[in-house]
């Protein structure tokens, strides 16, 4: 059995790490490289960096900090932000990232997933999906350009249908960002995760809502996700990585020890 992954998420805006609630009202958390070094030292399995405004500003993520991060950590890390072509993906990967993640650009051109996965392998192609429960439609819908509230809008894609589509196109992994839960620290959306798990044949990562050790356990156990991603609880030291792993292992989870 493959070990479940504990992943720290670092949202990047103008060269610093930020964090908001439900993808809004972001506040500065700290500098990129020191935080990356800290998490690697504390025993995190993987890091994910989202340049949250790169796509809306029509620019590629700044590669200088990617190179700097690669020099100070020895764990896998994924980078997202304005990747719109195979050449963009090449630039990010050649700067030191182990994986690239695309979101809005995949919604614009789903074939981009295929092009990148065929060039570099499915193992380094992650699809981020920003899912919001629309009460009027009584369905989870995919949101686009979520890095800028003034440009965010709801697509015509139901989350479940988009999950199927990106797998057909060559996604190697899916990060399901549950926007209704983001930053609230009240737990992951277990029901939504469990439904997506049924149709997701590639590694599935839960994102949005972690506030305690129990929340991580619930997502791993009840929804059988392959990894759990969090930001606020790690940034604010609400949950210590070493303690989290120790408690999950004690409850029978296959987790890499610190």
From Swiss-Prot:
Catalytically driven reaction(s): 5-[(5-phospho-1-deoxy-D-ribulos-1-ylimino)methylamino]-1-(5-phospho-beta-D-ribosyl)imidazole-4-carboxamide + L-glutamine = D-erythro-1-(imidazol-4-yl)glycerol 3-phosphate + 5-amino-1-(5-phospho-beta-D-ribosyl)imidazole-4-carboxamide + L-glutamate + H(+)
Pfam families linked to this entry: His_biosynth (PF00977)
Any single GO BP term: L-histidine biosynthetic process
Stretches assigned to coiled coil: none
Residues the record marks as active site: 11, 130
One Gene Ontology cellular component: cytoplasm
Enzyme class: lyase
This enzyme's EC code(s): 4.3.2.10
One Gene Ontology MF term: lyase activity
Main subcellular location: cytoplasm
Keyword Amino-acid biosynthesis: yes
Source superkingdom: Bacteria
Compartment annotation: Cytoplasm
UniProt entry keywords in alphabetical sequence: Amino-acid biosynthesis, Cytoplasm, Histidine biosynthesis, Lyase
Functional pathway: Amino-acid biosynthesis; L-histidine biosynthesis; L-histidine from 5-phospho-alpha-D-ribose 1-diphosphate: step 5/9
Subunit-level organization: Heterodimer of HisH and HisF.
Family: Belongs to the HisA/HisF family.
Biological role stated in the UniProt entry: IGPS catalyzes the conversion of PRFAR and glutamine to IGP, AICAR and glutamate. The HisF subunit catalyzes the cyclization activity that produces IGP and AICAR from PRFAR using the ammonia provided by the HisH subunit.
Protein name: Imidazole glycerol phosphate synthase subunit HisF
Species this protein is from: Buchnera aphidicola subsp. Acyrthosiphon pisum (strain APS) (Acyrthosiphon pisum symbiotic bacterium)
Name of the encoding gene: hisF
């Amino acid at each position: 059995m493959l070990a479940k992954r504990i992943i720290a998420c670092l949202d990047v805006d103008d060269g610093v790490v930020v964090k908001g609630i439900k993808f809004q009202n972001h506040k500065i958390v700290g500098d990129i490289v020191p935080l990356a070094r800290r998490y690697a030292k504390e025993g995190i399995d993987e890091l994910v960096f989202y340049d949250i405004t790169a796509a809306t500003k029509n620019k590629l993520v700044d590669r200088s900090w990617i190179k700097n991060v690669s020099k100070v950590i020895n764990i896998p890390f994924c980078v997202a932000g304005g990747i719109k072509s195979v050449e963009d993906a090449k630039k990010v990967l050649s700067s030191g990232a182990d994986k690239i993640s695309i979101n809005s650009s995949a919604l614009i051109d789903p074939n981009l997933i295929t092009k990148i996965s065929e060039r570099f392998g499915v193992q380094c192609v992650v699809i981020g999906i920003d899912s919001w429960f629309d009460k009027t439609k009584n369905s989870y819908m995919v949101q686009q350009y979520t890095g800028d509230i003034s440009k965010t809008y709801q697509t015509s894609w139901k989350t479940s249908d988009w999950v199927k589509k990106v797998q057909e196109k060559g996604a190697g992994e899916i990060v399901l960002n549950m926007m209704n839960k983001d930053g609230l620290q009240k737990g992951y959306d277990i029901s939504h995760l469990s439904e997506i798990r049924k149709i997701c044949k590639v590694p599935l990562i839960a994102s949005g809502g972690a506030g305690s050790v129990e929340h991580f356990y619930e997502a791993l156990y009840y929804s059988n996700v392959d990894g759990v991603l969090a930001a606020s609880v790690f940034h604010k030291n609400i949950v210590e990585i070493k303690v989290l792993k120790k408690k999950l292992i004690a409850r029978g989870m296959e987790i890499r020890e610190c």
